[in-house]
Regions:
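Short coil/turn linking the two alpha-helices of tandem helical-hairpin repeats
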Residues: 76-84, 119-128
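Positively charged n-region of N-terminal signal peptides that target proteins for export
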Residues: 1-4
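Residue signature of alpha-solenoid helical repeat architecture, marking inter-repeat boundaries
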Residues: 63-67, 108-115, 144-145
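Bacterial N-terminal signal peptides
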Residues: 8-17
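Short secondary-structure subsegments characteristic of cysteine-rich extracellular domains
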Residues: 131-145
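N-terminal alpha-helical interaction modules that lie
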Residues: 22-107
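Alpha-helix boundary/capping segments in eukaryotic regulatory proteins
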Residues: 107-110, 125-134
Length: 145
């Protein structure tokens, strides 16, 4: 149940904040990673603020719980001008699955990887969180099955 709660919460928050405004977005204004400060990878993500190989490996590992993966992404945070962590994660997934990023689609990815990609997209682009909705909905559907 806990595994599906965070993705559902994030999807609902995206629907609430999908219109671009200058008010704080619940996606970017809620630093829930603070509750996971005892997790080494969360600490690292907060300090680095950018996707690296170790963070990407952590997000793709089936051994790590989805709530901790979400906390890692939340700890990477966002910038008003945008970030490219989703793009960096896509490159990692291409290497992992031995595919070019143009060939990579969600059929090759786990539900957790799809969720991580969606949440990274939402965090990367403050003004267009709706771009993440299709991936988050797909991840949620796969997690329910």
């Amino acid at each position: 149940m806990k595994k599906a709660f965070i993705p559902v919460l994030i999807v609902k928050l995206l629907f609430i904040s999908s219109s671009a405004s200058f008010a704080d977005s619940p996606i970017t204004a809620t630093d829930f990673y603070e509750a996971y400060r005892d997790v080494k990878m969360v600490q690292r993500a907060h300090l680095e603020g950018v996707m690296g190989v170790e963070i990407a490996e952590f997000l793709s590992s089936p051994e790590n719980p989805i709530d901790v993966k979400a906390a890692v992404i939340n700890a990477i945070s966002w910038r008003f001008e945008g970030k490219n962590n989703a793009e960096l994660y896509t490159y990692y997934l291409g290497l992992l699955y031995h595919m070019s990023i143009t060939e990579l689609d969600t059929g090759f990815l786990s539900a957790d990887e799809i969720f991580c990609m969606g949440y990274l997209i939402a965090m990367d682009n403050y003004f267009q969180p709706e771009n993440a909705i299709p991936l988050l909905e797909e991840a949620h559907k796969l997690m329910k099955d």
